[in-house]
Amino acid sequence: MGIFDGKVAIITGGGKAKSIGYGIAVAYAKEGANLVLTGRNEQKLLDAKEELERLYGIKVLPLAVDVTPSDESEDRVKEAVQKVIAEFGRIDVLINNAQASASGIPLSMQTKDHFDLGIYSGLYATFYYMRECYPYLKETQGSVINFASGAGLFGNVGQCSYAAAKEGIRGLSRVAATEWGKDNINVNVVCPLAMTAQLENFKLSYPEAYEKNLRGVPMGRFGDPELDIGRVCVQLGSPDFKYMSGETLTLEGGMGQRP
């Protein structure tokens, strides 16, 4: 018996890849959750569905949803959530992991398009999914897990739109934790650091910069998307952590220490 047998978790950015979203999907699948995976790359979503259903005997609903800047973004999320309800009839956990951004561009050189990409794909997407899922999370007394970043906590160079989106998500999450507490919905934030395909590419392209970043992690390694990030998300969505809400957890191997 798994913690989430018969329950449904939505994971944005959950397509098949060496990514945090897919690591979370595997962790939830191992606990019996049926999954809704959203993202922009339909093939990666279909690949994830095939593998997760084959390995874990769960049901996966892949939904190609693009929430980058567009007048249709809000309606796309509404449609996606209605498809979830039509398929499963419930939502128990919402995990807002997806985010695009124009990284590495100094604030003084950011265009409105650069900034909009970060805000729409991160902050607006999280807001839309939270608002549309709320009635169903209320029914199940569910959980929301939103993703922020050390880029926002510590003001990383070249990350202005990304950091702004992530800190907006933290503020949104605290308000939701306050407003939705009466419904027994808990809302928490995770700031992850994990070895993803994107980070592997960075290692190949900039080995010296990669090693410098690695030396900044007290534990001496980048996290595993499933074991170090996904398993924590499983606990945050479980009954054992129900009383914790409005908090930010830094899963960065000791690098994200704050007073």
From Swiss-Prot:
User: Does NADP appear among the keywords?
Assistant: yes
What positions does UniProt annotate as the active site of this protein? 162
How temperature affects activity?
A: Optimum temperature is 55 degrees Celsius for the oxidation of cholate. The thermostability of the enzyme is greatly increased in the presence of NADP.
Question: Which GO molecular function, any one, fits this protein according to its record?
Answer: cholate 12-alpha dehydrogenase (NADP+) activity
Q: Which SUPFAM superfamilies match?
A: NAD(P)-binding Rossmann-fold domains
Q: Which keywords, in A-to-Z order, does the entry hold?
A: Bile acid catabolism, Lipid degradation, Lipid metabolism, NADP, Oxidoreductase, Steroid metabolism
One GO term of the biological process aspect = bile acid catabolic process
* E.C. number(s) listed in UniProt: 1.1.1.176
Role this protein plays: Catalyzes the oxidation of the 12alpha-hydroxy group of bile acids, like cholate and deoxycholate. Is also able to catalyze the reverse reaction in vitro. Is likely involved in an epimerization pathway of bile acids that converts hydroxy groups from alpha to beta positions via stable oxo-intermediates, which occurs in the human gut.
pH dependence of this protein's activity? Optimum pH is 8.5-9.5 for the oxidation of cholate.
State the name under which the record lists this protein: 12alpha-hydroxysteroid dehydrogenase
Reactions the enzyme catalyzes: cholate + NADP(+) = 3alpha,7alpha-dihydroxy-12-oxo-5beta-cholanate + NADPH + H(+); deoxycholate + NADP(+) = 12-dehydrodeoxycholate + NADPH + H(+)
Highest lineage ranks of the organism?
Bacteria, Bacillati, Bacillota, Clostridia, Eubacteriales
